[in-house]
Amino acid sequence: MSDRQAALDMALKQIEKQFGKGSIMKLGEQTDTRISTVPSGSLALDTALGIGGYPRGRIIEVYGPESSGKTTVALHAIAEVQQQGGQAAFIDAEHALDPVYAQKLGVNIDELLLSQPDTGEQALEIAEALVRSGAVDIVVIDSVAALVPKAEIEGDMGDSHVGLQARLMSQALRKLSGAINKSKTIAIFINQIREKVGVMFGNPETTPGGRALKFYSSVRLEVRRAEQLKQGNDIMGNKTRIKVVKNKVAPPFRIAEVDIMYGEGISKEGEIIDLGSELDIVQKSGAWYSYQEERLGQGRENAKQFLKENKDILLMIQEQIREHYGLDTNGVKAPEDEEGQEELEF
């Protein structure tokens, strides 16, 4: 053994003695290097994300204009986590969560942890406590724009508080990022958009809360309404475009188009028809849609209704789409920790 190797071994032993076993290791020594995921609740979004869902132990930012479907996207993720037996928490800084709508999306509201904090500091401290417990699989913060610093709440209306929220987010994310990775918790931050004053060229839109969230996020999703979905003169929902603006775990800039129906959330039938047609799993002849020898219906809405009534055919098409994109049909679960759900050491 060379002197350099002996010196390195001694340094590694010293680090492990001081900071604990596993504090430093060779990258190839990790037992499972695959990124563990949770399905997003939308097959189109799972394929756009490139790994079959949201990566565990990472920060996700979902932003877009008002009423574009940001909270709907987050609630679908909560429903998926709960279906896998996981624990979910929703920090409602906007004080606007509709439990009836959440239930319609498949969220078990009896098991969902809900907090409606008074200040931004309180919201982020609650989020940190939940993450550090190691017992929560997903935490949703709705929204960053509503995380008002305590100094601003206690001050007068006209007072200037320049950069307070950005400083709060920067400090919180420095503390949270390591804990989120260690506990394998998915942290979804919902954000609004603002317009910068005096921008003549380029995109004037920005997100509140400073730049820290942009840096710490592994995935950033931009949610926008593309068009209204009508049945006769009645508006039934919106065609929504979700763009993966940033992705550290797969190639970015992919786009998922989904139907968000009022009172129902993301239409699984709509995205199955669209993805199936793209891959020629579902055949389209004129206005008719068919699968193998089975006619699904004339027109997209009739085909959606047929799949809603015939779940076995829906699941068969879904499985073929997942196989084509190399996605796990059941979603990938995080490896079980030997210590179970005991509080993590940080």
From Swiss-Prot:
Q: Which GO terms describe its molecular function?
A: ATP binding; ATP hydrolysis activity; ATP-dependent DNA damage sensor activity; damaged DNA binding; single-stranded DNA binding
Q: Which residues bind ATP?
A: 64-71
In which compartments does the protein localize?
Cytoplasm
Name the GO cellular-component terms. cytosol
Q: Which keywords has UniProt assigned to this entry?
A: ATP-binding, Cytoplasm, DNA damage, DNA recombination, DNA repair, DNA-binding, Nucleotide-binding, SOS response
Broad class of the protein's primary localization: cytoplasm
The Gene Ontology biological process annotation of the record reads:
DNA recombination; DNA repair; SOS response
> Which InterPro entries would you find in this protein's record?
AAA+_ATPase, DNA_recomb/repair_RecA, DNA_recomb/repair_RecA_CS, P-loop_NTPase, RecA-like_C, RecA-like_N, RecA_ATP-bd, RecA_C_sf
* Family listed: Belongs to the RecA family.
Function, as annotated, reads: Can catalyze the hydrolysis of ATP in the presence of single-stranded DNA, the ATP-dependent uptake of single-stranded DNA by duplex DNA, and the ATP-dependent hybridization of homologous single-stranded DNAs. It interacts with LexA causing its activation and leading to its autocatalytic cleavage.
- Protein name per UniProt: Protein RecA
- Species this protein is from: Bacillus pumilus (strain SAFR-032)
